Amino acid sequence: QKMGTGPWTAARVCLAAVGPTEFAGWAQVGDEYRCDENGCNCGWVYPYLPGEPMGRRHPSPLIQIMATSDDQVANIWRPLVSMIGLGPLKDLLLPRGEFIRIVGTSGDKDMDRIDRVTASAQSRLGAPINEAFFDETGLYTKSNKLIEVFTTMRRGAAAMGGRSMETTNAFDPAQNSAAQQTQESQRSDIFKYWRDPDLALKRPDGKPFSFQNARERRKILSYVYAGAAHINIDSIEAECLELMETDSSQAERFFGNRLVRGGGSWLPPGLWEGCHASAVASAA
């Protein structure tokens, strides 16, 4: 929560739109990437090392950004538009209200663009996209029908040899969200980044720290927000204390980065899985 994933994703969108994200062979002595040869006048030049993978722009990018609502999409869209207006990409990326035109080479009005997708705005769903960005996938569930939208966009990207990326707060393990399905997947081609405090912080007896313990909670927050200079831990802890008065598990998920079931759970975490026949057999 409040780590700045929206602006970070916006930067990734810019890269997917006009950056050297497509494999262009292996570098030899003297090879380099020059922005001025790719429509950008920022003057940046990158000299490749021999044997290094080289990159090129996608010739006809079609990118979609998805979230649960317009307000949620705006967490990425606002910084994206600001980056374009205040940086060197304003000649390559042209905001047009509900979409952003990418100055490309295909000349196809249905390509070379960045679109926004929400539960209520799915008109471009099913398009052959090359990159998809999903925000707050911990809220995409079967009940709100966002799992279906999520998988449809994933299929569209896969068909074009594209990629997808998710950002989210820690999910509720009782909801079987898109984020949970991705986290639990065993596929080796999925990169997952999650600072799990329970793997790094333990008591002498091996038990995880308690979020109810003030000293241990502070250590959890310091670990989770390490490297985020813009975060004030005192402010985060104050918000935690207030939220814990009404929903302690939500405070642990949002700020402690822990996978904690909501207050309405009918079983403690791990109890059902631990009683599965295979688990009992392995413990015997």
Regions found by a protein language model. Name each.
Residues 1-284:
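Phosphate/NTP-binding elements of NTP-utilizing enzymes
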